[in-house]
């Protein structure tokens, strides 16, 4: 198993700052607001999601047992029926969004979360990413100003060292970012620093590293291999990861997904370690857990391999909780 290598990489990442990346050779092209308009079927689905979500809670709790994520206010299996739970909860916790200043780490101007917030009545939206999108942003800014009301800014930097004064924002949202942040301790403290008193931070992240397919790519080999990033030794894992012929046959999307594993850009944290980082930074609020359907299937169909994972010291919670949604107040 690769656990020693994972622990080593986790320690290295925890004491570092995420490297920054220069301007990509291919610039971002502006997408009009119509590109992000929800289909009628999607709007109908969002309307019924809260009811379906509530009706499935007992079923999903029975599926994993009481020991898995007892800290979670709700559970979801593969994100089903969660809908716009994040924004509903954030408004209950921090009030209406109108007139507020929003920070979106890990975003550029075409990101879905950017356009979601620009379509609201917030005062400003500030983007920051480890990739330098400055040139593309400056070209797109006149078009963005024509279509959206909020003030929009874009910065180049990392979560561990945010280039903003204390208490600059009312809201922070990240989507699929925190699973890649190595120094979560520093990132959580920085987000708390730039958030105003009473401000709300929304984080949806995953897959978490110890869950099924947690390296973002090994699950492409099939349902029996979703924990190979943990079960294989380092040499065998690297051979599987870098098998160009195999991934070429799987298609470009699955092949490109290897980027994160090859670069080792993960936090390597368990769900409870994330919660501790938030707590120490001064956040409190509600947490929702996303369960892995493929992880539950593996536990049922591969009992010997599952036992090996658990006996190696990985909790069933870390193996089955593939993602988290946190809505927390400073």
Predicted regions located by residue number:
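A C-terminal cap/extension of S-adenosyl-L-methionine-dependent methyltransferases
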Residues: 2-11, 147-152, 254, 258-330
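Class I SAM-dependent methyltransferase Rossmann-like catalytic core
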Residues: 47-95
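Class I SAM-dependent methyltransferase SAM/SAH-binding core
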Residues: 103-161
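Short conserved loop adjoining the S-adenosyl-L-methionine
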Residues: 161-166, 193
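A conserved beta-strand element that flanks and buttresses the S-adenosyl-L-methionine
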Residues: 173
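Short catalytic micro-motifs in class I SAM-dependent methyltransferases
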Residues: 176-180
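A short glycine-rich, Lys/Arg-flanked "PGG" loop and its adjoining helix->strand segment in the class I
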Residues: 185-200
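Conserved class I S-adenosyl-L-methionine
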Residues: 200-244
């Amino acid at each position: 198993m690769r656990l020693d290598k994972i622990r080593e990489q986790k320690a290295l990442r925890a004491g570092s700052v995420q490297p920054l990346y220069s301007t990509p050779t291919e610039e971002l092209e502006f997408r009009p607001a119509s590109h992000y308009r929800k289909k009628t079927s999607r709007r109908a689905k969002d309307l019924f999601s809260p009811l379906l979500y509530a009706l499935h809670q007992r079923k999903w709790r029975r599926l994993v047992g009481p020991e898995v994520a007892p800290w979670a206010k709700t559970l979801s299996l593969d994100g089903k029926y969660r809908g716009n739970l994040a924004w509903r909860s954030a408004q209950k916790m921090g009030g209406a969004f109108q007139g507020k200043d929003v920070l979106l780490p890990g975003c550029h101007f075409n990101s879905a979360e950017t356009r979601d917030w620009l379509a609201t009545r917030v005062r400003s939206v500030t983007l920051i990413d480890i990739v330098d999108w400055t040139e593309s942003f400056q070209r797109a800014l006149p078009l963005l100003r024509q279509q959206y009301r909020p003030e929009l800014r874009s910065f180049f930097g990392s979560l561990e060292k945010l280039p903003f004064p204390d208490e600059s924002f009312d809201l922070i949202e990240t989507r699929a970012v925190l699973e890649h942040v190595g120094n979560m301790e520093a990132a959580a403290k920085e987000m708390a620093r730039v958030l105003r008193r009473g401000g709300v931070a929304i984080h949806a992240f995953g897959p978490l590293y110890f869950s099924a397919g947690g390296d973002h790519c090994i699950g492409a080999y099939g349902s029996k291999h979703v924990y190979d990033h943990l079960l294989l030794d380092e040499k065998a894992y690297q051979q599987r990861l870098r098998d160009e012929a195999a991934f070429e046959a799987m298609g470009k999307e699955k092949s490109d997904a290897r980027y994160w594993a090859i670069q080792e850009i993960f936090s390597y944290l368990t769900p409870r370690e994330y919660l501790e980082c938030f707590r120490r930074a001064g956040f409190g609020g509600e947490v929702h857990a996303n369960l892995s359907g493929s992880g539950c299937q593996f536990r049922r169909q591969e009992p010997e391999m599952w036992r090996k994972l658990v006996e190696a010291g990985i909790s069933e919670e870390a193996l089955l909780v593939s993602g988290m949604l946190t809505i927390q107040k400073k």
